[in-house]
């Protein structure tokens, strides 16, 4: 290697981002959307930043058996989410670490105290540059929720949200400094676009029109409206099948057991839809989710609540190139705009049935929507999202 080559190699090495980062969030194998998000994000960042792999400080709910969870090696510290002293001890651990930056995933429900208030002394005790990712930005917060968001935002060097609407809301409702906010989309796996039939055959659904929705089951999913809609759908499309995929959310299971799932089963029986609606009651691996999505013709998220600023399941579905139907919650409004999906009125089973029938009756239109969604979602695949996060960390740390 001559001198010029040596110089070039040295310059190239100097451009590498070598950032030590700690991530505070729930984490796998805990069954939680943010846990899955954090695992996927850190996996993707590790590929781009292999010299300093991600360290995890996980939020543990002992009431859900968290003290018995066998976490992977990258989990370096566990916070008992309902114990304030545990947060302060974790802040000390972070401050004494060699981390350059701390990334916190925020959702009110994963932190202890009223409205997750324990996050305030935790964040205010951290002496490292801090990046917050907000998974919820409420339009009409309580006084306490607003105070929490404002105080932790004041401490952050940067704030990540996943849609522009959430950024606007942080500024208008919470008074957050716009210069701190950056929009980075929800990450998704890189799924091949293609025909559904080969995947239906693998799963035993050949010859059927599949409508699906997946995720941890809870009342906020609105599946009762999807089941009611299927009464009209099967009149026109007797081979249509609705798949409701995923086990009940652990917190729901602890608080009320399987009441919601049982209510869905009663609806299925009441409407005589046993051959057209299927509840798949298990926690799905990523490969299973991808397999079901690749077999799906129409993906539905009939959520009754309209304040949701992100939906990992809808993000996955557009990333798989699915024709999606959703109620107009904030995330859906943004990602399904410009002929990338259809919106329905919340709680209106008749409207949902009409939209499903329309897409089943018009396969060319369904394909057009699916292609538009897939093209839009290419910037959301994990390598692209990870690069945005890593570049943000570089700006924050000056590296």
Where do the protein language model's features map onto the residues?
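Carbohydrate-associated surface elements
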Residues: 165, 187, 248
């Amino acid at each position: 290697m001559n001198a010029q080559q040596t110089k070039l190699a040295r310059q190239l090495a100097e451009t590498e981002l070598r950032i030590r980062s700690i991530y505070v969030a729930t984490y796998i194998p805990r069954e939680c959307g943010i846990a899955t998000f954090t695992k996927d994000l850190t996996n993707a960042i590790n590929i781009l930043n292999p010299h300093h792999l991600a360290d995890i400080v996980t939020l543990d709910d002992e009431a859900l058996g968290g003290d018995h969870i066998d976490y992977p090696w990258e989990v370096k510290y566990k916070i008992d989410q309902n114990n304030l002293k545990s947060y302060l001890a974790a802040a000390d651990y972070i401050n004494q670490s060699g981390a350059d930056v701390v990334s916190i995933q925020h959702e009110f429900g994963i932190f202890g105290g009223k409205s997750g208030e324990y996050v305030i002394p935790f964040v205010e005790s951290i002496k490292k540059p801090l990046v917050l990712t907000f998974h919820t930005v409420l339009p009409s917060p309580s006084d306490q929720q607003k105070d929490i968001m404002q105080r932790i935002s004041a401490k952050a060097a940067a704030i990540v949200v996943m849609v522009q609407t959430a950024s606007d809301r942080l500024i208008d409702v919470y008074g957050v400094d716009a210069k701190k906010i950056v929009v980075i989309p929800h990450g998704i796996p890189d799924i091949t676009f293609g025909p559904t039939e080969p995947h239906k055959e693998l799963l035993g659904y050949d010859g059927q029109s599949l409508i699906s929705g997946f995720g941890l089951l809870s009342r906020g999913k609105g599946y009762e409206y999807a089941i009611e809609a299927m009464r009209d759908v099967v009149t026109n499309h007797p081979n249509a099948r609705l798949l409701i995929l995923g086990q009940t959310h652990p917190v729901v299971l602890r608080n009320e057991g399987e009441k919601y799932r049982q209510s869905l089963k009663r609806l299925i029986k009441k409407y005589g839809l046993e051959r057209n609606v299927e509840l798949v009651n298990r926690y799905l691996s990523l490969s299973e989710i991808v397999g079901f999505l690749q077999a799906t013709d129409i993906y539905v998220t009939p959520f009754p609540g309209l304040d949701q600023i992100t939906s990992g399941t809808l993000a996955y579905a557009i990333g798989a190139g699915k024709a999606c139907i959703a109620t107009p919650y904030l995330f859906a409004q943004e990602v399904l705009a410009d002929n990338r999906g259809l919106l329905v009125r919340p709680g209106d089973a008749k409207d949902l049935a009409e939209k499903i029938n329309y897409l089943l009756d018009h396969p060319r239109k369904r394909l057009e929507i699916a292609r538009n969604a897939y093209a839009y979602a290419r910037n959301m695949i994990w390598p692209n999202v990870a690069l945005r996060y890593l570049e943000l960390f570089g700006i924050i740390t000056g590296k």
